[in-house]
Amino acid sequence: MNITKILNRIGYVGPLHVNLKVLSNLQHAYLCTVPFENLDIHANVKIILDEDLFYKKIVENNRGGFCYESNSLFYELLKEIGFDVSIIAARMMISDGISPGYSHMALLVKLEEDYLVDVGNGQSVRDPMPITGDVISHSEGIRYKVGEYGHNEFALFHREDNTEWSPRFVFSTARRHLEEFKVMCHYHQTSSDSVFTKQRLCTLATAKGRLTLIDNTFTINDDGEINTESVDSVEQMQEILQNHFKIKMHISDYS
């Protein structure tokens, strides 16, 4: 795994000191260059929990990935730089409650205090978040903070204007290993109940908003100004993926 190539992939040019500023800059760089996407699932390409495969896909093939892929790669990058980082397990909040354990992966980075870091979520906080809950981050019209949730757990809370704080996902700070996510990785790719099998998704943060392709709809959020277009052909979808997400791949259908 070539760290220089990972840094080139995310367009990061700067110091590699072990501090909060560098961690934040690396996170921003990653989120604005590596899409959160599940295109392989809809192309019947199996996602295997293997760091070398994640590196090949994201760095060498200029693709994105979902939480296990992106957070695993970012974990390897931070570890090589010298950060005290660990993989942690989380559970996403869903319409009828909360998802099973290991349904989401995030990272915990220890500096002067512990920070939640996540580069593998469709829309989430862009900054390292201290689990003390002392910091509120704001991006894309949403505020975020970390707080205690139940016994020995924490949650990333979010709220929009004129709404109450609600948990986006729940996590513990216990160190986990990649292979522990195997069952849920398989579930996300195969279950009809999985959000990832229900719709094709590719989304990328930008400096002022977000680019999002969901099935046959492409949306550009530019500083709150929303523009949406319908995707009516395979060729149009592939053009959007290449021009906006820098992804070159064959799309078998667009239904």
What kind of feature is each model-predicted range?
Residues 1-62:
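Secondary-structure boundary elements
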Residues 2-5, 9-10, 14, 34-35, ...:
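His-Asp-centered catalytic microenvironments across diverse enzyme cores
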Residues 9, 80, 243-244:
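Residues at alpha-helix termini
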Residues 49-51, 98-101:
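Short secondary-structure transition/capping segments
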Residues 63-89, 107, 202:
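Cysteine-centered nucleophilic/redox motifs
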Residues 229, 234-255:
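Generic C-terminus detector
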